[in-house]
């Protein structure tokens, strides 16, 4: 009975041929090594070019927001608000205000008055690691 042809053996041979073909194709397409790829060199370049690149973004407007505090409320509570209603915020009196650029916390500060208008004095710039820590809360 060992002389009988097994259809599964024929399928395995066909699969082996397909794998061999795929491997040879992969070798032929990946013959160019990564070291041969040409990349533009960083550093040691023209510093004035970098300053010109920065000048391109200097006039892009951003939205600066100063947050006094936040709170959560239900729709029912929202609909009950009238003129004179007081909404309690989570920020404490005297606590630094959050300064956001395009919705991202970048600094903290305190309220000041400048020519009869509100202003904010920056008291602390938030480091990138501190921003990540605050976002994970």
From Swiss-Prot:
Cellular component aspect of the GO annotation: bacterial-type flagellum; bacterial-type flagellum basal body, C ring; bacterial-type flagellum rotor complex; plasma membrane
GO BP terms: bacterial-type flagellum-dependent swimming motility; chemotaxis
Pfam family name, one: FliMN_C
Subcellular location: Cell inner membrane; Bacterial flagellum basal body
Entry GO MF terms: cytoskeletal motor activity
Entry membrane topology: Peripheral membrane protein
Predominant place of localization: membrane
InterPro entries reported in the protein's UniProt record: FliN, FliN-like_C, FliN/MopA/SpaO, FliN_N, FliN_T3SS_HrcQb, SpoA-like_sf
Database matches in PANTHER family: FLAGELLAR MOTOR SWITCH PROTEIN FLIN, PTHR43484
Record's function text: FliN is one of three proteins (FliG, FliN, FliM) that form a switch complex that is proposed to be located at the base of the basal body. This complex interacts with the CheY and CheZ chemotaxis proteins, in addition to contacting components of the motor that determine the direction of flagellar rotation.
Family: Belongs to the FliN/MopA/SpaO family.
Matching NCBIfam families: fliN
Designated name of the protein: Flagellar motor switch protein FliN
Gene: fliN
